[in-house]
Design a protein with these regions (language model features):
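Alpha/beta-hydrolase-fold enzymes
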Residues: 101, 105-193
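Short beta-strand/loop motif that positions the catalytic acidic residue
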Residues: 220, 226-228, 232
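Alpha/beta-hydrolase fold nucleophile elbow
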Residues: 89-100
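Catalytic active-site module of serine/aspartate enzymes centered on a nucleophile-bearing elbow/loop
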Residues: 254-256, 260-296
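Active-site glycine-rich loops that stabilize anionic/oxyanionic intermediates
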Residues: 23-26
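Alpha/beta-hydrolase active-site loop
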Residues: 66-86
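Conserved alpha/beta-hydrolase
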Residues: 28, 35-61
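Short alpha-helix in the alpha/beta-hydrolase fold that links the catalytic acid
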Residues: 222, 236-246
Length: 296
């Protein structure tokens, strides 16, 4: 089963609905603050947890391991959640906010069902993951070989089970209180202790990347906002720029591209003034009616 958090706005006329697609090793509760800002602006918010994360179902008994058998499972599950949301709010537009791995999942979902989404916000999306010091072709080749020989549930080399380690200095956030809040939650709740990828996940991430870069970009009709962090160690910036460029050159819709100075990969985990600017960009984009298409 897919676990999903629901936050309903208490205003009389909500602006719409936002579905959040979280990132690798994350969970719905990490996005409490993100949900709060959308609620304040008059949106209902839903946060489904992807397979292998939080309280959703898993394909492995190891609570530290993020494993998937096929990338399509992520997309099917996410669209199933979106279908439920659309049925619950048939008169409201559905908007997508997606981060990192969730950007790949949400991005493909919006390519499979372009008419479902009113506007799409991709924050540090995983158009192509970075693979540390291993070249991308070598990393994907190793992952494929492991999957072929039945070792898809093995930890990727150099990765390990959750042990409570990790520091703010090496994290993807720039706000220490925001970082420490989730670190403490993770230490207290076993279901939040997803930590490392399997070779099956690595191969699935490669297949999602190829789909987005070869096919997905052609299918969008909803206006898109893509926000890139200044310091980025987890996703390819070149892939982000190429992805946005192809969407804009095709001309079916627009992809606004913003480079956020003073941020790391988790832009939503930034400090004061930078975070205010980030949310300013997002709500200006959502409030802009110039390119609106009715996708209810």
């Amino acid at each position: 089963k897919i676990h999903m958090l629901q936050y309903l706005s208490d205003i009389d006329m909500p602006k719409g609905v936002v579905v959040i697609s979280h990132g690798f090793t994350e969970s719905a509760v990490k996005y409490d603050e993100v949900a709060y800002y959308f609620l304040k602006e008059g949106y209902h918010v839903y946060i489904p947890e992807h397979c292998g994360h939080g309280r959703s179902y898993r394909l492995t008994a190891d609570p530290s391991l993020v494993h998937i058998d096929t990338w399509r499972r992520y997309i099917r599950d996410f669209l199933k959640a979106c279908r439920y949301i659309k049925k619950a709010h048939p008169d409201l537009s559905l908007n997508l906010y997606a981060h990192s791995m969730g950007g790949a999942i949400g991005g493909i979902a919006a390519a499979w069902e372009p008419d479902w989404f009113h506007k799409v916000i991709l924050s540090s999306p995983m158009i192509r993951p970075l693979t540390d010091n291993v070249p991308w072709p070598a990393a994907t080749g190793i992952a494929l070989e492991k999957c072929i020989f039945g070792k898809d549930e093995e930890y990727v080399a150099g990765r390990k089970p959750y042990d409570g380690s990790g520091s703010f200095e090496t994290s993807s956030a720039t706000s220490k209180p925001r970082y420490e809040r989730y670190k403490n939650l993770r230490a207290e709740h076993k279901e939040l202790q997803t930590w490392s990828p399997s070779y099956g996940w690595l191969w699935a991430s490669a297949e999602m990347s190829w789909y987005l870069r070869l096919y997905g970009w052609k299918k969008y009709t909803a206006p898109m906002l893509l926000i890139q962090a200044q310091t980025e160690d987890l996703v390819s910036v070149r892939a982000l720029k190429n992805f946005a460029g192809k969407i804009n050159r095709q001309g079916k819709t627009s992809c606004d591209y913003i480079h956020m100075i003073g941020t790391k990969h988790e832009i939503y985990g930034s400090r004061g003034k930078i975070l205010e600017k980030y949310w300013g960009y997002i709500f200006t984009f959502l409030d802009d009616t110039e390119n609106d298409i009715d996708h209810r």
